[in-house]
A protein has these predicted regions:
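Alpha-helical interface subdomain recognition
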Residues: 1-80, 152, 232-379
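Short, conserved beta-strand segments within well-ordered enzyme catalytic domains
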Residues: 52-56, 72-74, 85, 115-117, ...
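Glycine-rich, Trp-frequent "lid" loop and neighboring beta-strands that shape
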Residues: 63, 101-186
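N-terminal glycine-rich flavin-associated loop
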Residues: 83-101
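Flexible, small-/acidic-enriched active-site or ligand-binding loops
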Residues: 128-135, 160-161, 187-219
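Well-ordered beta-strand segments characteristic of repetitive beta-sheet solenoids
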Residues: 170-172, 211, 243
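Adenine nucleotide phosphate-binding catalytic loops in nucleotide-utilizing enzymes
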Residues: 220, 224-226
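Select transmembrane alpha-helical segments in multipass membrane proteins
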Residues: 227-231
């Protein structure tokens, strides 16, 4: 297991950073709190960089890269709070690629943007495939899919779907009449499909409630393992974006601690500040190691990917929550005002920790699998 980046991965990361640097994404994130149209359209940039085809095989016009590479791109997006729809895009393309779908060439070229409509895989606490609740904590079952000739008819709703607004194709995880998970590709504008944009705490996130009423789509030929992989890939992507945001929180806070003086000393010389920022660094390095492990496991040790992605999501979510609060603390009064970037990262932390089951769900998954492994070893 070698987590050192290859020359190609370093180039990919630097290219992503360079592409994103052309846009004032953090300034736009602040303006978008009042006017959503202030966010720049980053989709053309993503297409130019080849991101829609990151996980698509080369034979279909994609880059044929792996999860590790995709997480590097996601981390750079998180670094500058860029509103690039990777969480919805890449799990959807992974499912389409596994199915060898006819739309792959259009997806890889960026002519067709898919979005993943997720369902949570079964666990010890919840044995079925479930979706986010509209409110409260009780999760409901995934949409129902009924066979209708060569197509599937969908009924049901999925709430708080990342990157669904503006998508052309929805890749939906549903359950069939036998209770088995299926993937259905359906046009976002098809009859019986409603994509309702919802207000979000973090203006850089695009969310929608998606409803199906007798909507017809085509079944994708994939098994449950592919659908589980897509769920955990989404978790790993959220973790990577969070890690990028933690890095920015740390960099900005350290720079301020060096230049802000009080009582004749830089505030960074005081133990209260030093210890808090050291804890941010510790959490950052721990989370990045787990992110790299998840990226490696998806290709080289797929049976460990669920645990690795859950661990990365759990660690990175807690790290960003801590780092965003530390950023406000270090900056004092100015850190709590809209003139500063700190509240933007705090908002990102609070919304990210709640998406797709939330950080707590990932933590529960780690606990379940760790305890199960310990019990098996003791048996």
């Amino acid at each position: 297991m070698n987590f050192a980046l290859t020359d190609e991965q370093v180039f990919l990361r630097e290219a992503a950073r360079g592409s994103l640097s052309r846009f004032k994404t953090i300034e736009a994130a602040r303006d978008a709190l009042e006017d959503a149209s202030a966010l720049p359209d980053l989709w053309p940039m993503a297409v130019e960089a080849g991101w829609p085809g990151l996980l698509v095989d080369e034979e279909h016009g994609g880059a044929g890269l792996g999860g590790f590479d995709a997480l590097l791109v996601a981390e750079e997006c998180g670094h500058v709070l860029a509103a690039v729809p990777l969480i919805g895009l890449l799990p959807a393309t992974a499912i389409l690629d596994a199915a060898g779908d006819e739309t792959l060439a259009a997806v890889a070229s960026g002519a067709l943007r898919p979005a993943y409509v997720p369902a949570r895989p079964p666990s010890e606490r919840e044995p079925g495939w479930t979706v986010e609740p509209a409110s409260g904590f009780a999760r409901s079952g995934a949409p129902l899919a009924a066979a209708d000739g060569n197509q599937m008819t969908l009924d049901g709703s999925v709430f708080f779907v990342p990157d669904a607004p503006g998508a052309d194709l929805l890749v939906v995880v549903a359950i069939d009449s036998g209770g088995e998970p299926v993937a259905v590709a359906i046009e976002a504008g098809a009859d019986g499909v409603t994509v309702e944009i919802v207000m979000r705490y973090d203006a850089t996130r695009s969310l929608a409630n998606v409803s199906f009423t007798g909507a017809r789509g085509r079944r994708l030929d994939v098994d449950a393992g592919v659908l589980e992989d897509a769920w955990y890939l989404a978790h790993a992507l959220i973790a990577a974006e969070s890690i990028g945001a933690v890095q920015t929180c740390l960099d900005v806070s350290v720079a301020y601690a060096k230049e802000r003086f009080t009582f004749g000393r830089a505030i960074g010389s005081y133990q209260a500040v030093k210890h808090e920022l050291t804890e941010v660094l510790r959490r950052l390095e721990n989370s990045r190691g787990l992110q790299y492990y998840a990226g490696w496991a998806r290709r080289d040790q797929p049976e460990e990917f669920a645990l690795a992605a859950s661990a990365a999501r759990s660690s990175a979510g807690a790290a960003l929550d801590f780092a965003a609060r530390a950023m406000i603390n270090v900056h004092g009064g100015i850190g709590a005002t809209w003139e500063h970037d700190a509240p933007l990262f705090f908002r990102r932390a609070q919304l990210s920790r709640r998406l797709l089951g939330g950080t707590h769900d990932a933590t529960d998954r780690v606990a379940e699998q760790t305890l199960a492994s310990a019990a098996a070893a003791a048996a």
